[in-house]
């Protein structure tokens, strides 16, 4: 397999750094040429990453792409072999020590034998200007479990406690590494509602996730890394427009499904019973060909592809 291309594929018109940082505000994250290896294994191979203050950015990539390593560098737990990284103009360790950064890391443990309310009080005491206790509990939706032991919660409840611990100091930047991995669908929806309430305060969020629908719904911008490098950077809509086939969906009432693949613009045909989805490079041409085909159909709908399909095509094109 060929090595991953080194230049990120543009997915939107670049926005000047000066425009993003109007008023002279420091960018939340500025990283250039980050390289990190673990013995012979290369985790990052020259990653550049800029995140403006107030943005919500999703960090996507296949397993082993370097997402967790990137977050480890941003919280100062790791040090790059090469390259530079600053968080609000400071080295990451100084930004963390100054209370500017909160983080939810994968598999972070919770103190055994301590009740949730006690844990939150202890964590708040570590910061000079913590969130008020009532606001912290409300943001993390922890009221019903304050009296329970932190080590006896469900996976989703424990993640909400980790979220509360991460925001207890009212950080300007919140780093999330697979934050909803232990949650069911409803718990994930509730969690992102909590994140939206937090970002409404002007806070910055960078999150890594394997749930691409979360990135589509929650992120202002998506950064895709593969092979330790950035391969795409743009809004979810821009990435879907660049890499995702448009779709023509309808119910096939009569006619041979074999004719569908030959319609103009059709790249692939997906069927779920009588419901058909045509992935098309030119939906106008596909619809016109469908009308001329003699097939009987109903319930026509034309729309964009999803971020997951775009992500898979992007990875295929950059490997």
Where are these regions (language model features)?
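C-terminal coupling/interaction segments
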Residues: 2-12, 281-319
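Conserved structural motif at the start of ABC-family nucleotide-binding domains
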Residues: 29, 44-46
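Conserved ABC ATPase "signature" region
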Residues: 34, 121, 125, 131-146
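Conserved ABC transporter NBD signature motif
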Residues: 75, 83-97
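Conserved ABC ATPase signature
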Residues: 149-156
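Catalytic Walker B motif of ABC-type/P-loop ATPase nucleotide-binding domains
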Residues: 174-178
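ABC transporter nucleotide-binding domain
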Residues: 192-281
